[in-house]
């Protein structure tokens, strides 16, 4: 079990706009990380077959507990899409901040029917193919006050599993790693930029009534602001990755002793051989961005994927 409190976190301090300068850095926040770590292992053999397995699993609950006497939240990482992350007392730090979507308007009648209790249009600038945004606070107006927590970039669970097998000179080892209960804000899916190649999910865009209820129509600009920070950009970033796999064979000593070699082993090794994930970006293991305050954890601005490498080698003992 662990319970770690961090005090005096360095954060950009909020200042009024009339200050005329960028926000200074100060010891502003307190945070608590609590959880449990489990470490299990077992080794055994069946005749000439030896085996060993080890499991490491850790659960972490992260919570911001203090932001100063006069503050309960702080805006963190921002982007052309808007504020992407936020720090708020009583919630994970940081968390993704934005609007919730409820599908895509299929026709003009659906736009006209999306009204508040007084009959006013909730999204007067929308048209068929645009996102339907949720009136989270129920005040009959969709505005900045409807932004809410839409995910987080810090995993609940982190796991590692290692396996070792040996049989008559052959050996095999494998290390799997994974994380669960985590999301990524995939900015690389943007389709509102005319000077870059478009992601393949543009092929799934809304093209007419009934074509999709998940992807909006394609347009570089939208009066409905389809590309604002919302749960549309947030994806499940859970994964299991084969971090390392190695297969080897040790020649019998009776074959190598004639050339003054006590042990000779041949092996082939693969790193990052495969990754099991639903994430559509290059790499679900998104750790952070260009912020020095740790406020971009989970924001994928186009991270460079981890290389898949293959190695062939020989171990020789004289």
Where do the PLM segments sit?
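Membrane-embedded beta-barrel scaffold of Gram-negative outer-membrane proteins
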Residues: 1-20, 49-52, 58, 62
């Amino acid at each position: 079990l662990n319970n770690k409190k961090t005090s005096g976190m360095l954060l950009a301090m909020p200042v009024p706009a009339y200050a005329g300068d960028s926000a200074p850095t100060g010891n502003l926040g307190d945070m608590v990380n609590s959880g449990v770590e489990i470490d299990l292992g077992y080794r055994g053999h069946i005749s000439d077959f030896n085996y060993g397995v080890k499991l490491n699993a850790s659960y972490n609950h992260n919570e911001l507990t203090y932001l100063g006497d006069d503050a309960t939240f702080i805006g963190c990482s921002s982007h052309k899409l808007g504020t992407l992350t936020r720090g708020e007392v009583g919630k994970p730090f940081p968390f993704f901040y934005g609007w919730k979507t409820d599908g895509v308007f299929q026709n003009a009648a659906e736009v006209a029917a999306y009204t508040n209790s007084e009959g006013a249009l909730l999204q007067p600038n929308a048209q068929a193919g645009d996102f339907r945004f949720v009136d989270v606070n129920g005040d009959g107006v969709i505005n900045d006050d409807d932004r809410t927590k839409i995910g987080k970039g810090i995993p609940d669970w982190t796991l590692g599993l290692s396996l070792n097998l040996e049989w008559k000179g052959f050996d095999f080892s494998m290390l799997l790693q994974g994380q669960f209960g985590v999301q990524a804000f995939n900015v690389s899916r943007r389709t509102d930029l005319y000077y870059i190649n478009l992601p393949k999910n543009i092929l799934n865009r809304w093209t007419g009534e009934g074509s999709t209820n998940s992807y909006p129509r394609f347009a570089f600009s939208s009066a409905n602001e389809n590309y604002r920070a919302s749960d549309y950009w947030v994806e499940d970033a859970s994964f299991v990755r084969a971090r390392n796999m190695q297969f080897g064979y040790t020649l019998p000593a009776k074959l190598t002793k004639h050339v003054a070699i006590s042990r000779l082993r041949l092996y082939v090794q693969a790193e990052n051989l495969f990754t099991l994930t639903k994430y559509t970006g290059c790499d679900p293991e998104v750790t952070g961005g260009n912020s020095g305050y740790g406020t971009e954890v989970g924001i994928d601005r186009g991270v460079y994927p981890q290389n898949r490498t293959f190695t062939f080698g020989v171990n020789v003992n004289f």
